[in-house]
Every structure is written in C-alpha cells, then in structure tokens.
Amino acid sequence: MFQTDAPLAGRRQVARDTFVLAFEAPEVAAAALPGQFVNLLLRPGPLLRRPFSVHRRREGRVEVLLRAVGTGTAQLLDLEPGDSVSMLGPLGRGFRLDPGWGSVALVSGGLGAAPFPITAAAARAAGLRVTWVHGAHAADDLCSEWEGDEVFWATDDGSRGHHGSALDAVPAGVGTVLACGPNLMLAAVAERWPDAQVAVETYMGCGTGVCLGCAVPRIEGGYDRACQEGPVYRAADIDWRALPSHLHYGAPA
C-alpha cells in the first residue's frame, strides 16, 4: 500500500455522465491487482476519502471510472490536468484467477464495469477466454470501452442488446463468473452462481480497516471489513438480506 500525491493526467467520457480519470501514480499502478481499489482525497474537499476500483493500470497511471453522484465525485470531475489528489492504495483483496478454468465470464451492471478492464487483461494474460456481459438502463449508459474475446450487452429499455438483465444475457456454458454491480444484482448472481466471485459495495470511511464502516454481513454470522477481507467475496458467503441494496454503485467498497 502506498500513499502518494497523484496528478490528473487525463479524462475521457465513456458513457452518459460517466468518465475515466487517469492519475500519475507509478508505484500504485505497478502493485495494483484486479479487483483492488484506491482511496482518493481532495484538499480542500470532503473529510473522508472516496473509494474507486482500479479500472486500468498502464504507463505508470491508475485509471478510475466514476459518475458524479455527490460532492466528492463532482469535485473530482472538476479537476484540471496537473491537479493532484492524495491516493492511497492499492487496497483490499481482489479477484482470484485460475488458468485451469479455461474461460471466465465478467458480468457487470452500470458502474460495475469499473474493475473489469484490468481484470480482463489479467485473465487473458493467464490464458483464459474472456466473455464480458455488461448491462445498464439504456444504450447511452453502457460503458463504451471493454476488453475480452467477446462482449454481450443488456439494457433495461431494450435500446441495445438483450432487453432485460445482464444476468439473462450470460451465454450458456461460460466458465467461472466474476460480477460487479448493484447489490441487488449481486444477490441474484449468488442465487444462480453461488461460487461466483463478486465485488461488493458498501459504505466506507478509512479504507484501512480501522473505522469498521464497511461491514459486510456473512451468511454464517459475523461481519467482514470490505476494505480488508474484501471487496471480492464468494457470492454465497454473503448475507444479502442484511447488506444494503439501495446504494448507487460507485466503487466496490
């Protein structure tokens, strides 16, 4: 884990009201693994850091995917190239990839696409065939950037791809499922694919396990800290009835 001042290197739009921000952070980029996240802090700005999945890492840069859903994310989108944030990361436990699987399906809903470019690249490097299934409310909300061997789209309004849930667009016979998106979607993933790996969202304060604000209820009882034991879990290990389902996905933790 590193804490560094990370200048903004670039910004690009990838969906309606959705952007990728690239920050210069060579040490964090070199260490980041699929499914991990970084905590960003603006000065001056909100008191607490904001968690974001590592979207990509390349050329010493860490990329994050975000949409303005509050004061902190709105201020991040107002940054100009050269403006710096305090970056803490990489944090958490990410996706486990096994070359023996042969193939893997990445299933994302909305901003749940956030951790999957880095995950797809790592999976392909491990010799896995990658199928990415991405869903959103409408075509304009679908992330325009994807990686993998094939992609399937799903929209709630039927404006692109399958008319309905991304889960229903997953082709038969795919290998291990990795999923990220709203908790209601992940609860449905747990019913269909109990052994799937899911990146969960929850409230978070410190990102280092101290504040206990990111509690994830486990099905056998007790709680984990998403920033330490997560944010990636076996889907069936989470008590989805007790995990908040109303959060707007912004990061996996």
Predicted regions: what is each one?
Residues M1-P81:
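Ferredoxin-reductase
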Residues G10, R56, W153-T155, V198-V200, ...:
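Structural signal for conserved beta-strand scaffold positions within catalytic alpha/beta enzyme cores
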Residues R43-P44, P90, I219:
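Short, surface-exposed secondary-structure boundary micro-motifs
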Residues P115, L184, T202-V232:
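Local cysteine-cluster metal-coordination motifs and their immediate loop/turn environment
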Residues P217, G221-A253:
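Short Fe-S-cluster ligation motifs
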